Amino acid sequence: MDGTRISASILATGFEEHVMVNDGEIQHLRRCIELATEALELGDEPFGSVLVAAEGQVLFEDHNHVASGDRTRHPEFEIARWAAANMTPEARAEATVYTSGEHCPMCAAAHGWVGLGRIVYVSSSEQLAAWLTDLGVPAPPVRALPIREVVPNVAVEGPVPALAEQVRDLHRRFHSST
């Protein structure tokens, strides 16, 4: 593990808990923000995700592709598909998914069904909903739920306040241009 750890306060099921995110994890989360920026630059919603093996190597990364017309082309869903096709059940369970935003219910379900391990996210569904409301964006067709309401036994860490404002800015930019 890297030496420096950053404490992030999260709200989960009505109580506050602290999570620790180390330097390596911050680098993966920054890569997620870079991928989200790439999506934005391509005219897509700004989300990015990285799948990392237990040993620390990046296995797969992607950003949103919903502008293609297929609303299921979320990076977290693509990670689940890739992992199901390319990893053993044991390797999936030991892997970590880093992502710019908390999984939506569809992606959380895919994560659970495939048997992926821990999730670390920069911004929560609750934060995103508040940001979009502030921007006057209509509610999506699927209600946002915390990951643990969809996959109760998965290890989840986030949000990471030190990076969340960068994600908020990407959403502000996307929705001000649409």
Model-derived regions, located:
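Helix-adjacent hinge/juxtasegments
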Residues: R81-V114, R118
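Zinc-dependent deaminase
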Residues: D2-A39, H103, G112-T178
